[in-house]
Amino acid sequence: MKKFCYLILYFLSFLCLPASAKIRLPHILCDNMVLQQQADARLWGWATPRTRVIIKPSWGPSHTTVADKEGRWSFRIRTPKGSYTPLSITFSDGEAVTLHGILAGEVWVCAGQSNMEMPLQGFYECPVEGYQDAIADAGRIRGMRYVKIPAVMSATPKDDTVCHWEVMNANTANYCSAVGYFFGRRLHEMIDVPIGLILANKGGTMVESWLNEDNLKCYTNEPVDSAEIAERYPTDWLRPLLWGNGTFHPILNYSIRGIIYYQGCSNVDHNPNTYAERLSRLISQWRSDFKAPNLPFYFVEIAPYSYGNALDTAAASIRMQQQTVAESVGNAVLIGTNDLVYPVEAEQIHPCQKRQIGERLAMTAAARDYGFDQIFYRSPSFEKLEVRRDSCFVHLKDTYNGIVPVTSYEGFEIAGQDKVYYPAHAQYIHNSTFLLTSPNVARPVAVRYCYHNFQLGNVKNQAGLPLLPFKTD
């Protein structure tokens, strides 16, 4: 009997040992992914605690790391120069998992709210101009791929989420971000390496939706408790913290080249006066999260839209704050849009001209990150104002070889001491200067340009880029 009891205890002891588990990878590490070229790219996952994990890339020798007591492991591996040669990686902790069809290239995150989320097929009653041509071209963009991160909220930061990489073609392009698609297509034309797009965005979100708990606690009065968040923001897409936890946090270990960002519309009516500070915090946060202190951040000016009152200036204030961020944060560039909305789109918050936005972002990246240093990529902007009796002389910068001539320049206004603005007659004098006058203002003191919720501009530099909105008072 005693011997029998010992046998039972012996077999029970095996049941208490941890089961041998197949190594687990986050969903974003999968077949057909694009790895950032010539980088110490981070690979990570889960395995049996304290076990060795062997990583064997097809382009180099094996590497070994050890899972910690919770089964987590990570390792940085040097990736090859970008090419269209398919690669593979095998992971093993006794049982092998192999990823196939990997490419090395350039990886960019497409972040923000609905104008970045807007797919190539458009939204309901919101088409994307040039859709059919874009779909026809999709299969010819060699090595372009994307992964759509599910837009979900989470009370705590998520380490993984269900997703997979899509190979760009006519059947898959419909669901790719339109801005991301046109960005990737133009960049691919210029640098001829595979392009990977990580789509981590959610329509309707505020900048606070992407800030982490530490930043929200230290620099805002926003709630961080889920119940309090839901009480203050019944509309879920406006909720702070939760979208970043659920939709952005799962990608933070992935090695990337930069971020393109299109957001700000939801902040026109929510916390507008703190937008510049909070966007700056977000840029700093993401650079810290990706462990890349100078990570490129190229973002899009919110496009003209009425917001219920076309002549109001709330949206113009956000645009000015976007410029403040571009001027004060290193390696951040703002893309102008006041020329990319049709007059009939005053009530359309999702304007259809997405190609030009994506291409302007791509030209910015090409100039700043890929050696095309002769490209004109900056929009002209206000430099200084001189007032002489009834005339205002507005000096601009980044005009390059001058301003594109048109019959009548629209969007300028001037005001006197009473700060009542009137449309100005604008005369282009030379390379970077406009003369503004108005019969209604004898002694002007202030000038502004495109400073309404919905105001289209037609002042462009020789690169075809629009003058950014400004005001001098």
Label for each model-derived stretch:
Residues 22-473:
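Cell-envelope and extracellular/periplasmic
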Residues 1-24:
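Bacterial Sec-dependent N-terminal signal peptides
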